[in-house]
């Protein structure tokens, strides 16, 4: 006897998983989509061979959208949590599993949280992530205009005082997120992350760069600064606060604001964010790693 209807998005609903080999081609696709070309991904590393990017399976929760609520008009990725427990070598076979772990309402939006677990061939948990997706609460016909437009990010209420606590800065390059990068990261299908017309159909004026790309940029910054300390114990809790549009220039930033003891190691806590060329913040939150 089934307790829930097959189309219910309930906490505890299993969204399935897969077995996947982390191939060099998959890593090349990641590099093309993000611009993150760390030398460890293709050549020698402290572990003796190529290491996959920490977020190489960045969009595992999006392999099926059956966890989405029916009203997808104006839906947004609003928060991303990630824990990295062990490095993954290129060529490894992994097993994934996704499950809905939370559902809640705030103001005019309803949120669904999908957790992805990734295990290696020995059964070891190598990463856990939680993706918070928000959906407009249906309330009659769609309003005229866009759900989110470019002027929204200039609203004084959407300024975020990150980077003002001092601390050791972590610099990273800015890069333009081209439409080709969007297709490599979020394609090959036509959708609002790869095609302007598809974006307009969902209430946006232009291509909406997939939020996971900015999350990957923060992970790139943390990997370059902390190396194996991020790949063996990295954490991120990031909120996506403004839309990154196709062809915008962006980059991650960080400041080490605290160091805490963790066993025999030290864990630096980083105030992390992504910003556009004009200083508009698109992602804000915290990240940490182990100092090895």
Predicted region positions:
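Hot-dog-fold acyl-thioester-processing enzymes
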Residues: 1-79, 140-232
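HotDog/MaoC-like acyl-thioester-processing domains
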Residues: 1-10, 79, 84-169, 240, ...
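Short, glycine/charge-rich beta-strand/loop segments that flank catalytic centers
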Residues: 45-48, 116, 238
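A conserved acidic, glycine/proline-rich C-terminal tail/linker
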Residues: 233-237
């Amino acid at each position: 006897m089934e307790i829930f209807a097959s189309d219910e998005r309930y906490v505890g609903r299993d969204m399935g998983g897969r077995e996947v080999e982390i191939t060099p081609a998959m890593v090349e696709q990641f590099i093309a989509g993000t611009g993150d070309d760390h030398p460890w991904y293709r050549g020698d590393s402290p572990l003796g061979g190529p290491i996959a990017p920490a977020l190489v399976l960045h969009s595992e929760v999006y392999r099926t959208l059956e966890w989405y609520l029916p009203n997808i008009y104006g839906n947004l990725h609003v928060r991303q949590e990630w824990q990295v427990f062990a490095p993954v070598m290129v060529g490894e076979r992994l097993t994934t599993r996704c499950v809905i772990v939370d559902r809640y309402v705030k103001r005019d939006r309803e949120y669904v949280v999908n957790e992805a677990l990734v295990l290696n061939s020995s059964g070891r948990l190598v990463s856990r992530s939680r993706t918070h997706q928000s959906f407009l609460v249906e309330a009659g016909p769609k309003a005229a205009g866009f759900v989110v437009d470019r002027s929204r990010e200039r609203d004084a209420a959407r300024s975020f005082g990150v980077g003002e606590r001092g601390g050791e800065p972590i610099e990273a390059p800015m890069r333009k997120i081209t439409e080709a990068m969007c297709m490599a990261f979020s394609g090959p299908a036509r959708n609002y992350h790869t095609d302007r017309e598809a974006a307009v159909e969902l209430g946006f004026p232009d291509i909406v760069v997939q939020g996971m790309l900015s999350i990957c940029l923060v992970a790139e910054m943390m990997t370059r600064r902390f190396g194996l300390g991020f790949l063996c114990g990295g954490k991120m809790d990031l909120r996506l606060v403004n839309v990154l549009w196709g062809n915008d220039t962006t980059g991650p930033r960080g400041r080490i604001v605290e160091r805490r003891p963790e066993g025999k190691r030290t864990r630096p806590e980083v105030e992390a964010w992504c910003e556009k060329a004009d200083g508009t913040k698109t992602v804000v939150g915290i990240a940490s790693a182990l100092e090895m």
